[in-house]
């Protein structure tokens, strides 16, 4: 038991939240936090704004809240897409969407690194794939005359979410600061 606990701690595999029984791990949350932090830091620098706001108590709390809420939304979208599409079909559609992006452009690679702090492969995996899934879901909903925002609001209210990060809670519609 101790060995398992040690593995979970050192690998980042312990859950920070559960969404309909599916864990969001500390490593997944931490990765998403770092991507968002780097992006906002880059945006603030580009606009000659003070980046210290990101490191303030309120800045950290808000970024934690926003990143966890976004990660939960991604999980809800994943869950729905896995219900309506076979894995191979979903991957084919994702690949088709991503193939429309010129990933080999020097400017694209530099932008991914400067704005997100990610290599091209990581940018594809952690930014483009979730965005493609969101677009796929949006397309499915459009055919039903529904909007993604409305659908997400409905699904979030129906989801069973448990949050284990101190200072954050689930209010039935999103992540809020306590």
What are these regions (language model features)?
Residues 8-120:
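N-terminal targeting/tethering segments
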Residues 1-9:
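Single-pass alpha-helical transmembrane signal-anchor segments
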Residues 14, 107-111, 124-178:
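A C-terminal, polar beta->alpha supersecondary segment
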């Amino acid at each position: 038991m101790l060995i398992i606990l040690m593995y979970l701690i050192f690998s980042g595999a312990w859950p920070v939240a559960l969404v309909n029984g599916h864990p969001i791990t500390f490593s997944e949350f931490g990765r998403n936090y770092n991507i968002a932090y780097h992006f906002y830091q880059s945006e603030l620098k580009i606009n000659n704004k003070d980046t210290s706001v990101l490191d303030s108590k309120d800045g950290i709390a808000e970024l934690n809240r926003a990143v966890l809420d976004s990660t939960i939304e991604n999980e809800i979208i994943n869950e729905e897409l896995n219900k309506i599409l076979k894995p191979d079909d979903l991957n084919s559609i994702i690949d088709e969407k991503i193939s429309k992006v010129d990933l080999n452009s020097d400017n694209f690679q530099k932008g991914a690194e400067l704005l997100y702090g990610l290599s091209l492969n990581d940018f594809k995996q952690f930014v483009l794939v979730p965005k493609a899934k969101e677009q796929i879901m949006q397309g499915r909903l459009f055919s039903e005359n529904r909007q993604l925002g409305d659908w997400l609001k409905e699904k979030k209210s129906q989801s069973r979410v448990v949050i284990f990060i101190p200072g954050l809670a689930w209010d039935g519609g999103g992540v809020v600061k306590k």
